[in-house]
Amino acid sequence: MRCVVLFMVSCLLIVLLINHFEEVEAQKWNKCFLRDIFPGKCEHDANAKLRCKEDDAKKTLA
């Protein structure tokens, strides 16, 4: 019984780690994608990045 619980907990931890790494990779891709759409405009300050993301969101909704 103890081995089964240990196995289930280890599987759960592995699944959580894999999901975390997938989210990190998705965030890296998103930054690169924004840099390709708005070259030179989104990298200067935080407000510009926010405006570029909002503009991109408006384009996808339209």
UniProtKB/Swiss-Prot annotation:
Query: In terms of domain of life, where is this protein from?
Result: Eukaryota
Which InterPro entries does the annotation name? SCRL
Q: Name one GO biological process term.
A: signal transduction
State the coiled-coil residue ranges.
none
Give the residue range of the signal peptide.
Answer: 1-26
Q: Name one Pfam family in it.
A: SCRL
Cellular compartment(s): Secreted
Q: Name one GO cellular component term.
A: extracellular region
Give UniProt keywords alphabetically: Disulfide bond, Secreted, Self-incompatibility, Signal
The SS bond pairs are 42-52
Anything else known: By contrast to A.lyrata and A.halleri, self-incompatible species with full-length SCRA isoforms, A.thaliana is self-compatible with impaired SCRA protein.
Q: What does this protein do?
A: Truncated and inactivated form of SCRA, a protein involved in male-mediated self-incompatibility when active. Most A.thaliana cultivars contain such an inactive form and thus, are self-fertiles.
Q: Which family does the record assign? A: Belongs to the DEFL family.
Name this polypeptide is given: Defensin-like protein A
From which source organism is this entry?
Arabidopsis thaliana (Mouse-ear cress)
Q: Write the lineage as a comma-separated list.
A: Eukaryota, Viridiplantae, Streptophyta, Embryophyta, Tracheophyta
